[in-house]
Amino acid sequence: MFFFFFFFFDETNGKKSKREFDNAKWQKKANKGEWSELYTLYKLLSEQNLYPINIDNINGQRLRMPILSILRHTEQYLKAEYKIEEDGQIVINANGHNIIQIAKSDFDNIAPKLFEAIKKGAPNENGTSDSSFELPEFDEFRRNTCCPNIKCYSKNLGKGEKDKSDLYIVIHDFVTGQTPIQGFSIKSEIGNPPTLLNATDLTNFKYRLSDNLPDEKVAQINSMVDKRGHADIKGRVRAILDQQVSLEFSTINPNAKGEYVFLENLMLVDSMLPQIVSDLLVLSYSEDTRVLSALTDKLSEINPIGFPMKTNKKQYEAKVRRFVTDIALGMVPSAPWEAAHQAYGMLVVNTKGEIDCYHIIYRKSLEDYLYENLKFETPSASRYGFGKIETGPDGCQYFTLNIQLRFMK
């Protein structure tokens, strides 16, 4: 591939800034989801507009948000800004210093090639495709565009919190005339579906058994394994419920300081949300589906909390929608949530290579995408220490489940 790059270092600082990127850790391999993050940058610099999806749009016209610049972090204190000039050319600014200008046509050329390469993957010596692979034919372009890392770097915001935004985009808002900088997370429908909420020790939900089971029954349930020899969490949950014993929500794991951060975060969204999420988690094992929306419908039918639902049957759905949207826009189990969104939406690389933009200005479209495309997933029971009946200091028996949410596509 041949590209024309116009370098215009401001002698001292520009060269120094470029060297910082050249000396940064070079990421050689990545999976399809991570490669999609690099593709998103190049695709947006080619299109130079965002088109937020609005499901309520009936006239077919889409709001256009011109992109003025894109910011991408390589390390905690190393970032590049891709400024789009009036003629469409892109000026790359490294840590405050202009270092290179690249023609828009180069991004027009590279983006579709990168997309096709990501879809194909890279076959290994056995002829199959590894989950992580190299694409060395794009190395030169990556170096010249200050992209030593394939996956976007997540800044450390302190207090155990990572930035949810993969890219920051300065847009021209036609409505207000302002040029705000807005963060976006990136998801990809190429390759394995990504997670929305990752399992950690802090996502363990603890339940009290409504009645203690005999020791021999506890031993039998705790020893249940699946065909692969892993803990059979679904089988264990169903075995407990088959004893006419219910799992009553108790709490969520605290952090090392004894702080119930995730529990309090959920309560900030809605005081009943910890109970609702805990009930959904149990249903995800006792029912034959793991789809979030279907389980929420089932929970609404059961109505365990006893909401008045004669005139409004969306009590559970509305709260679950808020939960997944806040997770997508910034809430994490490890850091206090103040309902201040870090991200303004999601950029989804679809199977055609288009960038679907779900923006908070069309919140319902964003909520619909999340609510209709998520499922519960079982993380490693041995790694996160859940899935066994244990007796607490109070003599009651307890059982722990861990929550992880993954996109279905």
Q: What are the functions of these language-model segments?
A:
Residues F8-K164, V170-K409:
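Short, positively charged
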Residues M1-F7:
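Hydrophobic alpha-helical signal peptides and transmembrane signal-/tail-anchor segments
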